[in-house]
Amino acid sequence: MFDIGVNLTSTQFASDREKVISRAREAGVTGMLITGTNALESQQAQKLAEAHQDYCWSTAGVHPHHASEWSADVANTLRRLAEKKDVVAIGECGLDFNRNLSAHQQQEYAFDAQLALAAELNMPVFLHCREAHERFAAVLEPWLPKLPAAVIHCFTGTREELTACLDMGLSVGITGWVCDERRGIALREMLPLIPAERLLLETDAPYLLPRDMRPRPTSRRNEPCFLPHILQQVANWRGENVEMLARQVDHNARKLFGLI
């Protein structure tokens, strides 16, 4: 099982980052993608991936929260990072109209620019969308024929939005959000709609600790080593064999990010 979304550059991991990676290995996590959310963190993510070759890879991008930071210098930084073999996707990029930490116009501009970069470099995109589906689709769709692959990370949208994403050819990342008995029930019921070859799993660590873990981790910090719990629950709710699903999501991740 491959974790496609780990915020390993987070300061929450500053004191034990190497142990976090070791625990993931021991738990059976077969690889992980370290998320870049701005120019600096994308550089840090690449360095971590380089230090753990053939187990960690990274993305290079600007999260919509940081879209106001977009500039020609940032674009050039991402371009240079994308030349490195450890960097396998452009992103995390997209739109977030929930928290609006950057203006909508800035978000759309940075999103479109990163899609253009991914198309130019023939790289997959690692996508973010929250409460912005209509504009997200409008910006994304013209680029899809020029992109080798795309995954919408941490999907939490509606059934209609899921159908639209699948119709666009996107793969879908599922996190521990689905384990939340308050917010995750609707998503749980949608799991069987995702074709097996389009399903990816992720922790989004250190965020989104699965609420149904027992005993509950005392730190309340999510880690990649908790991915087996998400896998087990998703397999249960999809009515699938756990081992087969583990192999499937690992294959899906490696295929999407060009690792096989």
Curated annotation (Swiss-Prot):
<dbReference type="InterPro" id="IPR032466">
    <property type="entry name" value="Metal_Hydrolase"/>
</dbReference>
<dbReference type="InterPro" id="IPR050891">
    <property type="entry name" value="TatD-type_Hydrolase"/>
</dbReference>
<dbReference type="InterPro" id="IPR024918">
    <property type="entry name" value="Exonuc_TatD"/>
</dbReference>
<keyword id="KW-0378">Hydrolase</keyword>
<keyword id="KW-0479">Metal-binding</keyword>
<dbReference type="GO" id="GO:0008310">
    <property type="term" value="F:single-stranded DNA 3'-5' DNA exonuclease activity"/>
</dbReference>
<dbReference type="GO" id="GO:0000175">
    <property type="term" value="F:3'-5'-RNA exonuclease activity"/>
</dbReference>
<feature type="binding site">
    <location>
        <position position="153"/>
    </location>
    <ligand>
        <name>a divalent metal cation</name>
    </ligand>
</feature>
<feature type="binding site">
    <location>
        <position position="92"/>
    </location>
    <ligand>
        <name>a divalent metal cation</name>
    </ligand>
</feature>
<keyword id="KW-0460">Magnesium</keyword>
<keyword id="KW-0269">Exonuclease</keyword>
<protein>
    <recommendedName>
        <fullName>3'-5' ssDNA/RNA exonuclease TatD</fullName>
        <ecNumber>3.1.11.-</ecNumber>
        <ecNumber>3.1.13.-</ecNumber>
    </recommendedName>
</protein>
<feature type="binding site">
    <location>
        <position position="128"/>
    </location>
    <ligand>
        <name>a divalent metal cation</name>
    </ligand>
</feature>
<keyword id="KW-0963">Cytoplasm</keyword>
<dbReference type="InterPro" id="IPR018228">
    <property type="entry name" value="DNase_TatD-rel_CS"/>
</dbReference>
<dbReference type="Pfam" id="PF01026">
    <property type="entry name" value="TatD_DNase"/>
</dbReference>
<dbReference type="GO" id="GO:0000287">
    <property type="term" value="F:magnesium ion binding"/>
</dbReference>
<dbReference type="GO" id="GO:0005737">
    <property type="term" value="C:cytoplasm"/>
</dbReference>
<comment type="function">
    <text>3'-5' exonuclease that prefers single-stranded DNA and RNA. May play a role in the H(2)O(2)-induced DNA damage repair.</text>
</comment>
<comment type="subunit">
    <text>Monomer.</text>
</comment>
<keyword id="KW-0540">Nuclease</keyword>
<dbReference type="InterPro" id="IPR001130">
    <property type="entry name" value="TatD-like"/>
</dbReference>
<comment type="similarity">
    <text>Belongs to the metallo-dependent hydrolases superfamily. TatD-type hydrolase family. TatD subfamily.</text>
</comment>
